[in-house]
């Protein structure tokens, strides 16, 4: 437990069943040996182990663990406790009950825009955002001007954590156009910020060029020196504002499953705690960072 893979391992092995319970997943696959479709069962199990069971463990190492100052890390590594905060970058300002909302009709005079983090072997992430101008909702709820709502998303993965679907950029753009026609009929979607890497030229052609041919254009994101840290601080500020109801905040519609799955548990960088760990599944976070730093 603890570290970049904490949330994935916990969701995969720890949460589904008590320790020692064998989980079985059955699927039908083609067997090259028999030339038939057959049921294959995959198994997985979480088995608790303790350092006390290892007679060869150096007691100096145990003393080192007992002197860890971070109580969550100490409990994780000494007791094998998975039900601890895993060093999340926003865990202290995130509250699912506050920040995750059921979708509502976007007022006509609110701005709708989108942000984009490109990926091929790793996931890409498109986020659609509604920005409040202070106009109340039909049910009377009112949010401060410039409050941002992540209202929809498109996440390019293959079903495995942090693995992309290798979708062509032109096909991504075509799907964006299709979804915008479905999600926001008769509304204008303002082009928003994207990963600046999409403007890199390859044989005179860029990903941005391919997407523009399909009618999807972007603005450049702020990737200036220090922007990663500024982005994290701005996200924390917006989430805290939403909790305290003290100013423009940030909320996420409950249909944005990948944002909810990946962003609240993103760990801090162990070498630079003012940033998130960039080897984690941070793609929805990155498109969010581009959006909230967009001026």
Residue positions per predicted region:
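Short loop/turn segments immediately following beta-strands, especially the blade-tip
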Residues: 18-19, 131-136
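ASCE P-loop NTPase helicase motor core
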Residues: 1-54
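Short beta-strand scaffold segments in enzyme catalytic cores
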Residues: 124-130, 289
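ATPase catalytic-site recognition across NTP-hydrolyzing enzymes
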Residues: 50-118
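Mg2+-dependent endonuclease catalytic cores in nucleic-acid-processing enzymes, primarily RNase H-like
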Residues: 139-277
